[in-house]
A protein has these predicted regions:
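Short glycine/acidic-enriched loop and turn motifs that connect beta-strands
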Residues: 62-65, 119-121
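N-terminal signal peptide c-region/cleavage motif recognized by signal peptidases
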Residues: 13-15
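Short, surface-exposed coil-to-beta transition loops
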Residues: 53-56, 67-69, 99, 123-128
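Beta-propeller blade termini
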Residues: 39-48, 99-110
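Blade-edge motifs of beta-propeller repeat domains
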Residues: 19-36, 78-98, 207
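Acidic, small-residue rich beta-repeat scaffolds with periodic aromatic anchors
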Residues: 22, 109-207
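Acidic/hydrophobic-patterned starts of short beta strands in beta-sheet-rich repeat architectures
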Residues: 50-60, 107-115
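Beta-propeller blade repeat segments, especially FG-GAP/WD-type strand-to-loop junctions
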Residues: 23, 67-86, 131-135
Length: 207
């Protein structure tokens, strides 16, 4: 029985791995990174590693299953790109939810992702994650959550966290309309591979 369970687990792991192909180490364009049966769903250009050469962040989508892969590639001075980061869906499609991703952008050397995530029965969460390439990886330097009412689409609360300065700002936009700010201790910045939208959360009062 134990052997059967172990075999089933290996088979399941192999199936998951097969569903998330490994992207090539280098390519001429985002489309050239795409395996057969995949297409470019979203792409952004900009300098992410401060070498004055445009890099790309792109999302590939499977033509049949709709599964997604996030790729980040650094541009080469003589054309083409070198793959720096690949996410097989854990971040870009948390728990298989491809509807969560809204958009992404590259600004001032940082990579920003916006998600619309299910919250409580009355609210949705507009979550934004900001990463910077440092220490040879993409580290989370900022996070923001807007608590949005399902009833009238109004943003009632905003929590903004700056991990670089270790500062958090909480804004209540209801009738009392107040803003609070404080510093907090944070030992180690998380990498992109350690963050799962919907699971990641920070509470002002608990910092």
């Amino acid at each position: 029985m134990n052997r059967l369970i172990a075999f089933a687990m290996l088979l399941f792991a192999g199936t998951i791995a097969a569903q998330t192909p490994r992207l090539p180490k280098s390519a001429a364009s985002a489309q050239d990174f795409a395996p057969e049966g995949w297409h470019v769903y979203f792409i952004e250009n900009g300098d992410l590693n401060k070498d004055h050469v445009d890099d790309i962040a792109f999302i590939l989508q499977n033509n049949d299953s709709g599964s997604r892969i996030l790729g980040i590639a650094f541009g080469k001075k003589k054309r083409g790109y070198v793959l720096q980061e690949q996410d097989g869906g854990r971040f870009i499609a948390p728990k298989g939810n491809t509807d969560a991703f809204v958009d992404m952008s590259i600004q001032n050397g940082t990579l920003r992702f916006n998600f619309l995530l299910p919250g409580s029965h009355a609210y949705d969460n507009d979550d934004s994650f900001i990463f910077r390439f440092q220490n040879k990886r993409f580290e989370l330097i900022g996070w923001e959550r807007k608590l949005r009412s399902k009833k009238n689409d109004r943003v009632n609360e905003v929590t903004s966290v700056n991990f670089s300065t270790q500062t958090v700002i909480y804004e209540d936009r209801t009738k009392k309309s107040e803003t609070r700010q404080k510093h907090f201790d944070y030992d180690r910045l998380k990498s992109l591979g350690e963050v799962v939208p919907g699971e990641f959360s920070m509470n002002y009062d608990k910092l």
